Curated annotation (Swiss-Prot):
Protein name, as recorded: DNA-directed RNA polymerase subunit beta
Keywords linked to the UniProt accession: Chloroplast, DNA-directed RNA polymerase, Nucleotidyltransferase, Plastid, Transcription, Transferase
Cysteines engaged in disulfide bonds, as pairs: none
GO annotation, biological process: DNA-templated transcription
UniProt subunit comment: In plastids the minimal PEP RNA polymerase catalytic core is composed of four subunits: alpha, beta, beta', and beta''. When a (nuclear-encoded) sigma factor is associated with the core the holoenzyme is formed, which can initiate transcription.
Catalytic activity: RNA(n) + a ribonucleoside 5'-triphosphate = RNA(n+1) + diphosphate
Listed HAMAP family: RNApol_bact_RpoB (MF_01321)
CDD domains cross-referenced by the UniProt entry: RNA_pol_B_RPB2
Gene: rpoB
Organism of derivation: Vitis vinifera (Grape)
A single Gene Ontology CC term: DNA-directed RNA polymerase complex
Key word Cell membrane present: no
């Protein structure tokens, strides 16, 4: 965070700064640290030694540009070169060469990496910090049991527990535990050293009997006892070197390696003074931990809160990339060791370049970015989605929690999250509370802790100092809860203010305050900070809003919001979507695909993005905002991107809305809209779909791309050029051929149809032996072809197939079934599109654009939408834009309502429209029914809120099935639109059909249309010939499956005919 020109003022840090700092830390420190760990490698005879000279490593500038990497599905990476030496010990000769170790994917200006043509981002992980934690639990008798858990750097745990007799045990597995004396002795301490280093030696001596003395008589006997308990081995194992190695690998490496963060935490918690470079668990640590545990037993000491952020650490992009580089170097070490031995065996002279291969590093990073749970494909629905994705924090992933086992307490908001993790923005569903979002001012500290900035209040000095505090430090300060804006520090402060101290919220005098917040949005994430009047909303609805803003579709004509929060500009700029001038100069030339800027003696050509597809099929497009000959300054907006206007985020539209019921068409969150939104292209968006096909070399020969497909009709091939690829700019419909392809196949006489054999026999015509495998346009894909790419990779073998990609643009107007939402969690589905003349209209004759249900407000408690609605109306009439800071009630009571009413009153005066503000019902107005012209009985709230169109569109959801695939086991239709699946008729649906008495429809759904194999085959013949469908005589497949499953449980199910006369069972089986 940077200090401004005025003392005490600050700017919001870049939203991608955490990603940039993490990657720079990996390049500057992480690479060097891991290269220094690379050992010297010797051959078996110890004649040759290989080593790396870490002081001189270099990363080469990539050969390709970012755009080309995306275009050709390549990785945007840098080659890593290191000096290596090969030393012959007998002659003391050394051969030094610069070797190529591998490719390391680079980070671009968006904070993402391009791997195989895809934008990928690494999100931050929250893990339990290594160290020791004390807690107590009640046993079945209601007695407190105290335990101390040592968490290693790898996530392994070693538990110390104390029983009723004050004996201390170390739990080595779920069932097995050993005495603390045995563990200390196995780690190298004798009894005298143990008793000298503890505060309560009499307690240790109290449970030292003869049997225990024998176990700790020597280090070897202690190790044997430890191994016997740990590995659950019976008999009398013999001490050996291999036994020690196994114990070291399986226990000590996983549970006793603390790392530098763990060493620092244990030193602080146990008041030790062990050097920081000693990152392994020592006997002194175990004994000091036992002392503290005894103190806990007798009421001395404080238990740890495991969910406090001071007990968590952030595993950032730097740590994850460094771990992968270390793993790659271990693999490289094994390769070099094997290559040296092979060269000596075959009497070859090795060189450093011959010994090293780039495969381990390159493949490790490719598999990490492709398969690791914390490496995700960048969500590029809109600019907000891009920057929010990189600021996520996750408890999930390797070494973390899982969605099914995480408790409610871990998911809940903790006081230490204040200013660090947003209390609102989290995912919905099973991962709620486990995936959060960092607050806008939060940063990752040196020790992996989340830090938040505060202003220090000092009586001695008038200067305001800004501090970044970790969660462990700000507990000791009285923190005022943001009682004033950072810009208004000169105003007289109130005498009594709300404050936070040691996780409690208090009300104290201003003189006692140590720190105060620096910004009203300090506690929120970017998504929550874009919600105006957020303090008037229920937190659940604010959560939905911050998630739904990320689902907004960029519209063809974007529009700035009338009511905003002030963060829209920075959110747009940090997303990298608008083009910004890097230096001042003059515009020489501009058109749709580039801007040429002249300045500082250079001429710079800036390319613009033209109809680029995002991974959510939305359209990314840039439009120049400067004219030729205009002089510009550094930082000025040159071009707007998708969903930005004038360098500000613009996700939706300001539309005229009325809150009223209308013939039941807006019940249950349905929305009624005017046809003006369709014909005026208000909510029209462009979507780009990608279709691709590959050509392979088969065993019968290579596949061919051609426009001569004998199997198909001519009108399906009308859009193909001479090469067999669809012509750029052509309009294509469902079923049209995009790429013509023929696959050769084996020609057998028996495989020909009878007419083909006749043609061959009579006329000697050679029938085609190729099968058409063309790329056809699927259902719902109609549109305009805007781009065709034929990617030919080097080599041309079957392992490097040629790829042809066709991009088709669709123009989608808003329609019935689409989802729209406001910024307060008020979402709904379009239920009906009314003609303009039928919509309710205002007193000045304007018809409203949307009609929302007023019952959706009081029960959801998202009243912020009413404030935004009314203020938007005033802003639309006065041609003003408002930027509202949250929690303005701290300045005066009812501040938000006063602001809205004053602006409505001013709009009423300036426009001479008294209906805008009527004192009897302020904020409401009488409106008229468009069908009859009569006024409605009650006054209605009307306004101009900001409404978004979401990515959940009916064109992507609508689906029908006449016939399709069936599951192999149950013989029932598959599930899902992608598999052409059917609609599920469950238990409650059956009840509903039974309630209406539709027996035949119910029978069809459970037999013909589902899993009765014979009956569904007969239906086809009956519909062709005519007549009635025969009733099924035997059971459907799912019933037969149930019978088979019962048989597998040794339960036989038989059925018999029962006589109607005497109800006796006829033993003849039916």
């Amino acid at each position: 965070m940077f200090r401004g020109g005025n003392e005490g003022m600050s700017t919001i840090p870049g939203f991608n700064q955490i990603q940039f700092e993490g990657f720079c830390r990996f390049i500057d420190q992480g690479l060097t640290e891991e290269l220094y760990k690379f050992p010297k490698i010797e051959d078996t005879d110890q004649e040759i030694e290989f080593q790396l000279f870490v002081e001189t490593y270099q990363l080469v500038e990539p050969l390709i540009k970012e755009r080309d990497a995306v275009y050709e599905s390549l990785t945007y990476s840098s080659e890593l070169y290191v000096s290596a030496g090969l030393i012959w010990k007998t002659s003391r000769d050394m051969q030094e060469q610069t070797i190529f170790i591998g490719n390391i994917p680079l980070m671009n200006s968006l904070g993402t990496s391009i791997v195989n043509g895809l934008y990928r981002i690494v999100i931050n992980q929250i893990l339990q910090s290594p160290g020791i934690y004390y807690r107590s639990e009640l046993d079945h008798n209601g007695i407190s049991v105290y335990t101390g858990t040592i968490v290693s750097d790898w996530g392994g745990r070693l538990e110390l527990e104390i029983d009723r007799k004050a004996r201390i045990w170390a739990r080595v597995s779920r069932k097995q535990k050993i005495s603390i004396l045995v563990l200390s002795s196995a780690m190298g301490s004798n009894l005298r050293e143990i008793l000298e280093n503890v505060c309560y030696p009499e307690i240790f001596l109290s449970f030292l009997n003869d049997k225990e003395k024998k176990k700790i008589g020597s280090k070897e006997s202690a190790i044997l006892e430890f191994y016997q308990q740990f590995a659950c081995v019976g008999g009398d194992p013999v001490f050996s070197e291999s036994l020690c190695k196994e114990l070291q690998k399986k226990f000590f490496q996983q549970r006793c390696e603390l790392g530098r963060i763990g060493r620092r935490n244990i030193n602080r918690r146990l008041n030790l003074d062990i050097p920081q470079n000693n990152t392994f668990l020592l006997p002194q640590d175990i004994l000091a931990a036992a002392d503290h545990l005894i103190g806990m037993k007798f009421g001395m000491g404080i238990l740890d809160d495991m969910n406090h952020l001071k007990n968590k650490r952030i595993r950032s992009v730097a740590d994850l990339l460094q771990d992968q580089f270390g793993l790659a170097l271990i693999r490289l070490e094994n390769v070099v060791r094997g290559t040296i031995c092979g060269a000596i065996r075959h009497k070859l002279i090795p060189t450093p370049q011959n010994l090293v291969t780039s495969t381990p590093v390159t493949t490790t990073y490719e598999s990490f970015f492709g398969l690791h749970p914390l490496s995700q494909v960048l969500d590029r629905t809109n600019p907000l989605t891009q920057i929010v994705h990189g600021r996520k924090s996750s408890y999930l992933g390797p070494g973390g929690l899982t969605g099914r086992t995480a408790s409610f307490r871990i998911r809940d908001i903790h006081p230490s999250h204040y200013g660090r993790i947003c209390p609102i923005d989290t995912s919905e569903g099973i991962n709620v509370g486990l995936i959060g979002s960092l607050a806008i001012h939060a940063r990752i500290g040196h020790w992996g802790s989340l830090e938040s900035p505060f202003y220090e209040i000092s009586e001695r000095s008038k200067k305001v100092r800004m501090l970044y505090l970790s969660p462990s430090r700000d507990e000791y300060y009285m923190v005022a809860a943001g009682n004033s804006l950072a810009l208004n520090q000169g105003i007289q402060e109130e005498q009594v203010v709300p404050a936070r101290y040691r996780q409690e919220f208090l009300t104290i005098a201003w003189e006692q305050v140590h720190l105060r917040s620096i910004f009203p949005f300090q506690y929120f994430s970017i998504g929550a900070s874009l919600i105006p009047f957020i303090e008037h909303n229920d937190a659940n609805r604010a959560l939905m809003s911050s998630n739904m803003q990320r689902q907004a579709v960029p519209l063809s004509r974007s529009e700035k919001c009338i009511v905003g929060t002030g963060l829209e500009r920075q959110a747009a700029l940090d997303s990298g979507v608008p083009v910004i001038a890097e230096h001042e100069g003059k515009i020489v030339y501009t058109d749709t695909d580039k801007i040429i800027l002249s300045g500082n003696g250079d001429t710079l050509s800036i390319p613009l993005v033209m109809y680029q597809r995002s991974n959510k099929n939305t359209c990314m497009h840039q439009k120049a905002q400067v004219r030729r000959g205009k002089c510009i300054k550094k930082g000025q907006i040159l071009a707007d991107g998708a969903a930005t206007v004038g360098g500000e985020l613009a996700l939706g539209k300001n539309v005229l809305v009325a809150y009223m019921p209308w013939e039941g068409y807006n019940s249950e969150d349905a929305v009624l809209i005017s046809e003006r939104l369709v014909y005026g292209d208000i909510y029209t968006s462009f979507h780009i779909r990608k279709y691709e096909i590959q050509t392979h070399v088969t065993s019968q020969g290579p596949e061919r791309i051609t426009n001569k497909i004998p199997h198909l009709e001519a009108h399906l091939l009308r859009n193909l050029d001479k090469n067999g690829i669809v012509i750029l700019g052509s309009w294509v419909e469902t079923g049209d051929i995009l790429v013509g392809k023929l696959t050769p196949q084996m020609a057998k006489e028996s495989s020909y149809a009878p007419e083909d054999r006749l043609l061959r026999a009579i006329l000697g015509i050679q029938v085609s032996t190729s099968k058409e495998t063309c790329l056809k346009l699927p259902i719902g894909g109609r549109g305009r072809v805007i781009d065709v790419r034929w990617i030919q990779k080097k080599g041309g073998s079957s392992y490097n197939p040629e790829t042809i990609r066709v991009y088709i643009s669709q123009k989608r107007e808003i329609k019935v079934g689409d989802k729209v939402a406001g910024r307060h969690g008020n979402k709904g589905i379009i239920s009906k599109i009314l003609p303009r003349q039928d919509m309710p209209y205002l007193q000045d004759g304007r018809p409203v654009d949307m009609v929302f249900n007023p019952l959706g407000v009081p029960s959801r408690m998202n009243v912020g939408q009413i404030f935004e609605c009314s203020l938007g109306l005033a802003g639309g009439l006065l041609d003003r834009h408002y930027r509202i800071a949250p929690f303005d009630e701290k300045y005066e009571q009812e501040a938000s309502r006063k602001l809205v009413f004053s602006e409505l009153y001013e709009a009423s005066k300036q426009t001479a429209n008294p209906w805008v503000f009527e004192p009897e019902y302020p904020g409401k107005s009488r409106i008229f029914d468009g069908r009859t012209g009569d006024p409605f009985e009650q006054p209605v709230i009307i306004g101009k809120p900001y409404i978004l169109k979401l990515i959940h569109q009916v064109d992507d959801k609508i689906h029908g099935r006449s016939s399709g695939h069936y599951a192999l086991v149950t013989q029932q239709p598959l599930r899902g639109r992608a598999k052409q699946g059917g609609q599920r008729v469950g238990e409650m649906e059956v009840w509903a059909l039974e309630g209406f008495g539709v027996a035949h429809i119910l029978q069809e759904m459970l037999t013909y249309k589902s899993d009765h194999i014979r009956a569904r085959q007969e239906v086809l013949g009956t519909t062709i010939i005519g007549g009635t469908i025969p009733n099924p005589e035997d059971a459907p497949e799912s019933f037969r499956l149930l019978v088979r499953e019962l048989r597998s449980l040794a339960l036989e199910l038989n059925h018999f005919l029962v006589s109607e006369k005497n109800f006796q069972i006829n033993r003849k089986e039916a």
